């Protein structure tokens, strides 16, 4: 079971060619699932049609938009209420980060992705924001304040996602919701780069650890590739 951004690919980038070939062969001999906050079109852009089809199931939008071989099997429709939306607008307008590239609110099935720098940012603007956020912890601050102000009242939760985003869903509609489909699996191995508290892999990682499964909190896709290669060598 794999996250995409920062786990199989560089953030918002495409899968490495050599890793892609290795991962396709891995998919042929294992039950492989993807669970990502990104929508279907972005996931296909990142991993490619062949990998997308080779997975037994892809859980897009944190499990709120689900596909098997490009056929949609489930979609959760949801819209963020006005008050928390206005809070995010206010944080955007008063952010100390000067570069606002546009497309700051990305509504996806069952979730909203919010970004201060914006999804239209250039690669350099993304790097600049990563440095800014690493120092100022802006996304962590927004997410924590958001959850305190709106979490219980609106039954919603916010988590830090990817390098520049914040994912907002209804409570119980994060990535951990997909585990209801895996009750018959005796062994699950999960790979994710945002397994820390406040990250959008945290809830599913903690649920799996609590059930006796294995979680690899990876640093990047190179780390994932290394671990999978070592697992393959051990099994042969």
Enumerate the predicted regions with their spans:
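A short, Lys/Arg-enriched amphipathic alpha-helix followed by its capping loop at the start of a domain
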Residues: 1, 18-30, 149, 185, ...
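Asp-based phosphoryl-transfer active-site loop
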Residues: 1-14, 34, 201
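Active-site phosphate-binding/coordination module
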Residues: 14-104
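Mg2+-dependent phosphoryl-transfer enzymes with acidic/Ser/Thr/Gly-rich catalytic loops
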Residues: 15-16, 169-236
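Substrate-recognition element of Asp-dependent hydrolases with the DxDx(T/V) motif
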Residues: 24-46, 58, 103-116, 158-162, ...
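A generic structural motif
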Residues: 28-31, 153-157, 186, 210-214
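Conserved acidic, metal-coordinating active-site core of Asp-based
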Residues: 99-189
């Amino acid at each position: 079971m794999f996250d995409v951004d920062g786990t199989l690919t560089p953030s918002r980038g495409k899968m490495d060619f050599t890793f892609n070939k290795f991962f396709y062969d891995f998919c042929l001999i294992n039950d492989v699932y993807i669970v990502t906050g990104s929508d279907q079109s972005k996931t296909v852009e990142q991993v490619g049609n062949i990998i997308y089809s080779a997975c037994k199931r892809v859980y897009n939008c944190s499990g709120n938009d689900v596909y098997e071989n490009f056929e949609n099997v489930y979609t959760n429709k949801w819209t963020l209420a006005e008050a928390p939306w206005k809070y995010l607008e206010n944080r955007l307008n008063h952010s100390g980060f000067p570069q606002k590239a546009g497309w700051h609110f990305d509504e996806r099935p069952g979730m909203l992705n919010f970004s201060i720098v914006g999804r239209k940012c250039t690669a350099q603007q993304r790097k600049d924001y990563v440095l800014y956020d690493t120092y100022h912890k802006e996304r962590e601050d927004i997410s924590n304040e958001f959850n305190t102000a709106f979490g219980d009242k609106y039954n919603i939760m916010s988590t830090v996602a990817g390098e520049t985003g914040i994912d907002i869903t209804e409570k119980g509609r994060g990535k951990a919701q997909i585990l209801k489909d895996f009750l018959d699996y005796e062994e699950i191995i999960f790979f994710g780069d945002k397994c820390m508290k406040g990250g959008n892999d945290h809830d599913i990682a903690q649920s799996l650890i609590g059930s006796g499964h294995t979680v690899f909190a990876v640093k990047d896709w190179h780390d994932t590739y290394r671990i999978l290669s070592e697992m393959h060598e051990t099994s042969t």
